[in-house]
C-alpha cells in the first residue's frame, strides 16, 4: 500500500498514530493530502510516529500544521512539497533517506518548495542523509527559528533560489559531512536568494569538515518574484565556532562576482571563535584572515578570538561574578 492517508478532504486531523512501512514512491508521502491537482487544506498532523516509509513521510499542503511528530527513517525524506501558511514545529526529523536518493536532488530531512509564510520552529533535525532543512524554489516570507540542526550529511539550513526569509535563534553543529566540496557543507547556506536576515544563531563547524554561514551566487535565472540573485542579505549577531582547521565563512560566487560583493550583502556584529585569528577562515573577494575580512568592510563591529583567548576571557568573567 502506497499511502496511509490520501485525499483532498479539508480540515483532517491525524493524531497519535504509528504510520510505518508504506510503499510510497519518491516524492509521495505516507501522508499525502493531494490527488492530481486537487489538494486537501487545513490538515493537522500531531503526535504521530511516521517512520520506515519508502518515499516521504509527510507531504505538505496549504494550511497544514505538523507538530510534535517523530519523523524518522523514511526512505527519501521526512517532510516536503508545496503549500502556503504551513507550520512545522516541535518535531524530531532524523535518519531520513535510508534508501540513498541523491541528496542534491531531493532527500534528507525536509524540503519545501514554492511556499509562502512557512514557519519551521523548535524542531530537532539530525542525522539525515542530505540537507537538514531546505527551502528550494520560490519560497517567500519564510521563518526558521529555534531549531536544533546537527550532524546532517548536507547543509544544516539551506535557502535556495528563493526570497525573503528570517533565519534566527537556531543551533547548528556538525552538518556537511557528506557534501563538503566548496561551500556545500555550510551550517547555514543562503544560495541565490535575496532579502534574507540571518541572526542570533549558534553555528559550530566540525574540526574535519563543514563551513559556517555562507552567501553563494551562481547563474540560476529568475523565478516567480524576480531574479535568483544573492543581494540584500544581512548576517548579524551570530556566533560561529571553528573547532579546527576545516571550514570558512562569508560569501562566494562562481558567476558575476560583483553582483554578490556590491549587492548590499553584509556581515555585522558577528562573533567568531577560531584556533587562531591569523587563519584564513573568512571569504570575501577571496579567502582571508580576520583583519583581511574586516578590511573589506565586513564585521567591522564584530569580534574574533582564539579558543585560548576566549577561554581566558570567559574564566575572568566567571571570576568576577
Regions found by a protein language model. Give the residues of each.
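Serine-dependent protease modules
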Residues: 65-66
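LRR N-terminal entry segment and analogous cap-like coil->beta motifs
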Residues: 11, 16-22
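Glycine- and acidic/polar-rich repeat regions and solenoidal domains
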Residues: 2-5, 20-42, 51-61, 72-319
Amino acid at each position: 500500500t502506497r499511502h496511509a492517508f490520501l485525499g483532498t478532504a479539508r480540515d483532517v486531523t491525524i493524531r497519535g498514530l504509528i504510520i510505518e512501512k508504506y510503499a510510497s514512491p519518491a516524492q509521495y508521502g505516507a501522508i499525502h493530502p493531494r490527488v492530481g491537482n486537487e489538494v486537501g487544506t487545513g490538515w493537522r498532523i500531531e503526535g504521530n510516529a511516521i517512520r520506515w516509509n519508502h518515499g516521504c513521510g509527510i507531504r505538505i499542503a496549504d494550511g497544514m500544521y505538523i507538530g510534535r511528530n517523530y519523523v524518522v527513517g523514511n526512505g527519501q525524506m521526512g517532510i516536503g512539497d508545496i503549500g502556503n501558511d504551513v507550520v512545522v514545529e516541535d518535531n524530531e526529523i532524523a535518519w531520513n533517506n535510508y534508501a540513498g536518493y541523491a541528496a542534491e536532488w531531493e532527500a534528507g530531512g525536509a524540503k519545501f518548495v514554492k511556499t509562502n509564510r512557512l514557519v519551521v520552529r523548535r524542531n530537532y533535525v539530525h542525522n539525515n542523509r542530505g540537507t537538514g532543512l531546505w527551502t528550494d524554489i520560490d519560497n517567500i516570507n519564510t521563518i526558521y527559528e529555534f531549531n536544533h540542526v546537527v550532524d546532517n550529511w548536507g547543509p544544516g539550513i539551506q535557502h535556495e533560489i528563493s526570497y525573503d526569509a528570517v533565519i534566527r535563534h537556531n543551533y547548528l553543529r556538525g552538518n556537511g559531512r557528506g557534501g563538503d566540496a566548496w561551500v556545500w557543507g555550510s551550517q547555514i547556506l543562503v544560495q541565490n536568494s535575496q532579502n534574507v536576515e540571518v541572526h542570533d544563531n549558534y553555528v559550530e563547524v566540525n574540526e574535519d569538515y563543514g563551513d559556517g554561514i555562507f552567501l553563494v551566487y551562481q547563474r540560476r535565472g529568475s523565478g516567480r518574484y524576480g531574479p535568483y540573485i544573492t543581494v540584500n542579505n544581512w548576517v548579524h549577531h551570530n556566533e560561529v565556532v571553528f573547532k579546527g582547521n576545516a571550514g570558512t565563512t562569508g560569501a562566494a560566487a562562481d558567476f558575476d562576482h560583483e553582483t554578490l560583493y556590491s549587492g548590499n550583502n553584509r556581515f555585522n556584529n558577528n562573533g567568531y571563535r577560531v584556533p587562531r585569528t591569523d587563519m584564513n577562515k573568512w571569504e570575501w573577494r577571496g579567502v582571508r584572515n580576520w583583519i583581511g575580512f574586516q578590511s573589506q568592510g565586513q564585521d567591522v563591529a564584530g569580534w574574533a578570538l582564539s579558543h585560548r583567548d576566549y577561554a581566558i576571557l570567559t574564566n575572568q568573567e566567571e571570576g568576577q561574578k
